[in-house]
Amino acid sequence: MDTKIDFKDPAYYENRELSWIKFDQRVLSEARDKSIPLLERLKFVSITSSNLDEFFMVRVASLKDMVHAKYKKRDIAGMTATEQLSAINKQARELVNIQYSTFSRSLMPLLRKEGIYLLDAHEDLNEEQARFVDRYFMENVYPVLTPMAVDRSEEHTSELQ
């Protein structure tokens, strides 16, 4: 029996964007692994969050541009930009729900047991703590802040000409 595989068949491919979310699911699974040290687990939640930020700023923004431009071509996995956005919306929501649950219901109680507390707001600080945080931010953080994303306008590149 001679069966040939049609490598153009979308069934053989995973959508690039959805595979990114699956990767983040695997990263987040490390945060749920009780055999991993607590602060490492917290780091995996942070990595997932950072990855999702970049994913939405770059990949989802690109798909939205395609939809806006009425680009209808399907990717190698057979999905249009609109279909990808719909699937991303569903899967990213599920991922963020698991991420939030992992952080707030699993890791935060364990962190508190270790004497590590996260404050919800500036209002949780007493006056002395608030002054310290404000001063620290202005002296150490603010001076090195740089934009992580810029728009495509010429304002940012006009000085280069």
Functional labels for PLM-detected ranges:
Residues 9-52:
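N-terminal-proximal low-complexity accessory segments that begin disordered
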Residues 16-20, 40, 48, 77-84, ...:
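Secondary-structure capping and boundary motifs in well-ordered enzyme cores
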Residues 32-35, 45-121, 126:
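Extended, charge-enriched "interface" segments that sit outside catalytic cores
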